[in-house]
Amino acid sequence: MKTIKIILLLFCIILGINAKAQTVGYTYKALAAEGCNMKYSVAKQDTMYSIVATVRSDRMNFLSEPTMKIRTFSGKYLELKGTVIGNGSQSAGIISGNVVIPVTEISSTAQFWITPQQFEILNEGVAKIRLSMTPMNHERTFKKDKIGKKLYRFYQKEKQKDENF
């Protein structure tokens, strides 16, 4: 009974941590490949805002100077320049019968600079996004907005932190 309480407590703590996280993301599988998991967040350094994008995949990495191209549902176009701020990998193995199958996951993070005026455009909703990566670009088209309005809300929260200091 005590172990059930501990497990339940840990589950609630983990759920609470995930609820406080200021990220928005999606999983994308193109052409039956392994796909990737994308996460986006908003950060502020001094007076500059940026969108921080992280990809977790079996092979995709950001280029050294990546670009993020965004088309909104109203047809407006944004092109953001960025820099890579981190690359990493994790390896594990899956046991199938008496064979160990190696599994490697690559994580790459890039930071894209954005102005408050561009955040206003993002609030219209993101219809399409393209990120320059290697070995191939990541491109996703949305039928409904999944990231635009949320990124705008994250921007508003970052802006309020300065105003309420």
What is the role of each PLM region?
Residues 55-57, 74, 116, 135:
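Beta-strand elements of well-folded, non-transmembrane domains
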Residues 64-92, 131:
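Extended low-complexity, serine/threonine- and proline-enriched intrinsically disordered segments
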Residues 41, 52, 67-69, 79, ...:
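Ser/Thr- (and often Asn-) enriched beta-sheet segments in non-cytosolic proteins
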Residues 12, 42, 59-61, 101-103, ...:
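Sterically constrained small-residue positions within well-ordered secondary structures
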Residues 1-25:
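Bacterial Sec-dependent N-terminal signal peptides
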Residues 22-72:
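An ectodomain-focused feature that recognizes extracytoplasmic/extracellular
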Residues 86-165:
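Internal interaction segment
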Residues 36, 74-76, 136-138:
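Short acidic/polar mixed-charge low-complexity motifs
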